[in-house]
Structures are given as structure tokens and as C-alpha cells.
Amino acid sequence: MVSQLVEAGFVNRYGPNQYGPGLPAALLYRRCDVARLLARIGKPVLKQLASETGLTSHLGVLENGMVTYKVRIPGKAPRAATFTREGMQLEAYCSGVGKVLLAGLSDEALEDYLDEGDFVPLTPRTLVAPSALRQNILNIRRTGIAIDDREVSEDMVC
């Protein structure tokens, strides 16, 4: 099958067992909206999560140090989040979704983010010191749980 892709130009062979995308594949990739595809795949999972927990569920992507919310499924709980909306951006360093995305960065990319950041407190509880943010992100990596404890808004825990 790989030989057919090489023959068609979709895959380039650079050496023994070394392959990369050919021009047609690269052009096709440029036309693909990865975030939209991810949202389409993730929506059923988020619906189930919101249904089972009663809480609002989100899917976001990291764009230039900000979280862009691509999917928002409202929960049925009385205090389900009403703050967010699809297409909205929030600072990654203080939002639950943003912290999850930051925890998924490589160590080098996380350090770059912390080095270039101008972290502004949105509430008195917002973590803004790079050392505190680093520790928080490392804890998220360890536990798999990210919490925004009134860091974006005084009346919102995420």
C-alpha cells in the first residue's frame, strides 16, 4: 500500500524506512480544518459526559497561548456553566481547559509559554507567578485533573 502512495505522489521516500508526506498530501492537509474535525469527533463524547455529570462540557484548542472553545455542551445542573460559548477565547493559564492543554505540552513548549507570558490576575485567586503555574501544571500531569478554582471569575469553579 505504501508503494502505491509513493507512486501516486502522496508519500515521498527519503531513505530506507523513511517516508514523509508528498505534495498532494500536504495540500490536502492545508485544506483540512483539524479543529473542526476534532470537534465533530468529540461532540458525542462531550454530550455523554454532560448527560452523565449534569455539568457543562467543553472541547478547546490552544491557539497563541489562549484556549479557543470549539464545542460547548451545556449541562442540566442548576449551576451549569453559562459563562463560556463556542468560539470564545480565555487565557490558558487560569482556565480548566487551558490548564489541561498546557499540561499536554512538551517540557520545552511549556517553558517557552511560561517565559513569554505576561500573566494578569483576573481574580485574586489567579495564579500568575511562573513558578506557581509550573507547579500547578506538573501536578495536573501527575493527577490528570485540572481545576480553575475561581481564577477566571469569582463565582465559577471549573
Language-model-detected regions and their locations in the chain:
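Basic amphipathic alpha-helical segments that dock to polyanions
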Residues: 1-8, 140
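Generic alpha-helical structural context detector
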Residues: 3, 99-103, 138
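Amphipathic alpha-helical effector-binding/dimerization core
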Residues: 20-116
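Extended hydrophobic
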Residues: 125-158
